[in-house]
Amino acid sequence: MTELLSREEYAAIAATLDLPQRAFIDGGFRDACGGRTFASTNPATGELLAQVAACDAEDVGHAVASARRAFEDGRWRSRTPAERKAALLRLAELLEEHLLELAVMESLDSGKPIRECQHTDLPETINTLRWHAELIDKIYDSTAPVGSAALAMVVREPIGVVGLVLPWNFPLLMLAWKIGPALAAGCSVVVKPAPETSLTALRVAELASQAGIPAGVFNVVPGGGREAGEPLGRHPDVAMVSFTGSTATGRLFLKYAAESNLKRVVLECGGKNPAVVMNDVEDLDLVAQHVVNGAFWNMGENCSASSRLIVHAEVREALLERIGAQLREWRMGDPLDPRNRLGALVSPAHFEKVRAYLDQARTERLAVRFGGATEAGIFVEPTVVDGVSPHSRLFREEIFGPLLSVTSFDDIDEAIALANDTVYGLAASAYTGSLRHALRLSREIRAGIVTVNCFGEGDASTPFGGYKESGFGGRDKSVWAHDQYTELKTIWIDAS
């Protein structure tokens, strides 16, 4: 792990950055066909970073055509597994060589604390690419038991051109979660980053070219959802879209697929994730540490954030006191200051959305136990709101900011009912000193990821995705991610 630098050293790196501004199509940078651009700004300061190419349907068409040519002529998919593996491992090496550059770029573009970009996002991005690269030559096809008169093979083939639509909260990491298995499988990709955070995806595309990934295999079209996302979702030569973002936008991609070529759609959408704390926990200080990290890491801009604390009434007050003590250690401020654990929210529009929920808490006359204030710019203190009922908007709606709602219960049946009282089902955490309670909570909570006595999402080897309106169609990460980027084919050879 690279050592953190001083704020001044990060600022010096920022001053030397050559920020990418144009779309990356067919192996090189190019302006948007219409010549339009949009402003990429630093959320912490409002400062203009770059005028980025604003792609539209024409640009998407060029990118898809480039990807389709690359797929059809086999310049990538026909390479041996060892050759694709070598290129992806080289890309991971290049990301490591440019780690500080990419970490600073990510922090400037997203408002994320540099300590998280450098010590979490970049290492996990690099590890994800290496993990999928190493998996390439360890996936076997199979034969079916049909007798000696025939040979029946069941094989997987790359699905084709894939549209990868990224969120703004983890631009680099979500890029790796998707390009890792997609490129490993032999697909060609067209990446549509969020307009709020387009810069690092463009830089990674450039590094991918240097790593030996052929022209046309890795394309990036920055732009808005209607202008670039919808044309990608509707394009007849796109075989699949993998989307991470809001449930509302996920529904649109299902519509685009239904109204075009019935392309495969994999959705990873929202979450309103519970942290259930039983009264038999052994270490409330440790529980408080995990709850605070789960709720406020990345400013709560995390689809798997533990935004609902569901706590047994007997330990509620003691736990809240410890949460308050933990929060005193969470500094908020300049994202390039490595002492800060909380940076700016991603945009003024998102800041106003989060602030509206703070106002809602006051309207409902709920107890704001900690935080609740905003600071100059678009900074929001980590906020804990107590006494939240299951009917409150704070309990039911995904806020995607540093706001933790607190609801108490009296027995495990009530806890499970509260945990499942949501349209989402992405993640959950359970804290208990009882193996019996741990097994029951982890089995009965309807979520794709359940952690016990910790907060997390597993590592690259474990699938990430959810139930209900949190998405469907596949999973990010792990060996299961590879399946969704392939088609299953049966080959029957009559040997009689």
Curated annotation (Swiss-Prot):
The active site is at residues 268, 303. SUPFAM superfamilies: ALDH-like (SSF53720). Signal peptide: none annotated. GO terms for molecular function: nucleotide binding; oxidoreductase activity, acting on the aldehyde or oxo group of donors, NAD or NADP as acceptor. It is an enzyme of class 1 (oxidoreductase). It comes from Pseudomonas aeruginosa (strain ATCC 15692 / DSM 22644 / CIP 104116 / JCM 14847 / LMG 12228 / 1C / PRS 101 / PAO1). The record marks 457 as: Important in defining aldehyde specificity. The keyword Ubl conjugation does not apply. The keyword NAD applies. NADH binds at residues 166, 168, 192, 246, 249, 256, 269, 353, 398. Homotetramer, formed by two symmetrical dimers. This is Aminoacetaldehyde dehydrogenase. InterPro entries: Ald_DH/histidinol_DH (IPR016161), Ald_DH_C (IPR016163), Ald_DH_CS_CYS (IPR016160), Ald_DH_CS_GLU (IPR029510), Ald_DH_N (IPR016162), Aldehyde_DH_dom (IPR015590). Keywords: NAD, Nucleotide-binding, Oxidoreductase. Belongs to the aldehyde dehydrogenase family. Its EC number is 1.2.1.-. It catalyses: aminoacetaldehyde + NAD(+) + H2O = glycine + NADH + 2 H(+); 3-aminopropanal + NAD(+) + H2O = beta-alanine + NADH + 2 H(+). PANTHER family: ALDEHYDE DEHYDROGENASE-RELATED (PTHR11699). NAD(+)-dependent aminoaldehyde dehydrogenase highly efficient with protonated aminoacetaldehyde (ACTAL) and 3-aminopropanaldehyde (APAL). Likely participates in a still uncharacterized metabolic pathway present in proteobacteria species, in which ACTAL might be an intermediate, yielding glycine. Highly prefers NAD(+) over NADP(+).
